[in-house]
Amino acid sequence: MESISMMGSPKSLSETFLPNGINGIKDARKVTVGVIGSGDFAKSLTIRLIRCGYHVVIGSRNPKFASEFFPHVVDVTHHEDALTKTNIIFVAIHREHYTSLWDLRHLLVGKILIDVSNNMRINQYPESNAEYLASLFPDSLIVKGFNVVSAWALQLGPKDASRQVYICSNNIQARQQVIELARQLNFIPIDLGSLSSAREIENLPLRLFTLWRGPVVVAISLATFFFLYSFVRDVIHPYARNQQSDFYKIPIEIVNKTLPIVAITLLSLVYLAGLLAAAYQLYYGTKYRRFPPWLETWLQCRKQLGLLSFFFAMVHVAYSLCLPMRRSERYLFLNMAYQQVHANIENSWNEEEVWRIEMYISFGIMSLGLLSLLAVTSIPSVSNALNWREFSFIQSTLGYVALLISTFHVLIYGWKRAFEEEYYRFYTPPNFVLALVLPSIVILGKIILFLPCISRKLKRIKKGWEKSQFLEEGMGGTIPHVSPERVTVM
């Protein structure tokens, strides 16, 4: 695979791959690139190549019919003719059609074949499409790449995340050629090494929110539980005790009581994972021991949990702003005014309630502002503009501040009602009491980690210090035998 002398007299790689003795592909206007196939991806790829100054030759089973869908400057011909005109060929056909090129394998000797195909599902075949293509044409230089880019992105030009293309090949020089070609097409190539990485590259476009599944399930489960909890307390209890029908509260009021609890619980889960990781390292006295799989997965999903927390907080704000618009709220307001007049009360001002509501709303706005900052800095383009210290300060320090202010928001909302018997319906605590449990645990755990006796030990562990007991029993050696390459930084 590494040799290209089979094309005739020994030549350098650039002389063999490119026509007319061109060195490299820096002058794209003199390079001919072949595309096997005439589908949507082949059409978009051809347009992209032409815009970047390449000459394109299309190999098709029916060139007369296919030529109607390509620009007139494109040479549309049969497979055999196309393969003889270029040394860099995009194989833009499905896996089941690879064998159609079998009779032309003598024309593919020493040429670069770029496999851009994808499968219908993850791990559909025992080997990747690129490895299968390499087994069919062992004398060709197979490169996997451009399969993560859609035809739409190719035609309109790469933008943002669609600029990245993953490339792998067993031939280093062929891989470098395709990497340079990707740069000429204004993509950002990412070298993933040998062709064994092709299976992972082919699975990338087929994954559907892999890291989001767990957090979404957790969020839905929490929302369902707290919704039913509020429904039983605020709707079923009045009906069972006083035959009072409060079912009208379900669409807005019950939902709005559920949203903030889920939001603050998800935010607590974001930072609880880090506390458990720190406790794990303190317990074993080392940072070289891998976390349990469940904790490792939890740590990887913190961004998704935080964004879901921000989503529930934003929806909570929208619902809260709509509360005064409800017809039921207007009726309640009129009833209160009538009762006040009937009781001959001239002034219903309550200083304590005024201060409570003012502080409650103020803390809510501050927590939402900090959550917005956390959400914005999680955007890749924004986080890439920050150095590590800036990013960790926002996501860690300000994140804990946001959690603390959110906890104050809930505390002031509950005020003294946690100690009043009438709010314990069916002998269950109020919603805000449940909402405070997990944030309080996280804040208390963070305070414990700030203690000098613990923080100093944790810093030593992060710098590589280990307990001798772990080295003797777990590692079976001394510190010089520990390889830094084995460390997994979460």
Swiss-Prot record:
Its cofactor is FAD; heme b. Coiled coil: none annotated. It is a multi-pass membrane protein. One of its GO terms (molecular function) is ferric-chelate reductase (NADPH) activity. It comes from the Eukaryota. Heme b binds at H316, H409. It holds the Pfam family F420_oxidored. It is found in: Endosome membrane; Cell membrane. GO terms for cellular component: cytosol; early endosome; endosome; endosome membrane; Golgi membrane; plasma membrane; trans-Golgi network transport vesicle. Keywords: Cell membrane, Copper, Electron transport, Endosome, FAD, Flavoprotein, Heme, Ion transport, Iron, Iron transport, Membrane, Metal-binding, NAD, NADP, Oxidoreductase, Phosphoprotein, Transmembrane, Transmembrane helix, Transport. GO terms for biological process: copper ion import; copper ion import across plasma membrane; endocytosis; Golgi to plasma membrane transport; iron ion import across plasma membrane; regulated exocytosis; response to hormone. Belongs to the STEAP family. This is Metalloreductase STEAP2. It comes from Homo sapiens. The lineage of its organism: Eukaryota, Metazoa, Chordata, Craniata, Vertebrata. The gene is STEAP2.
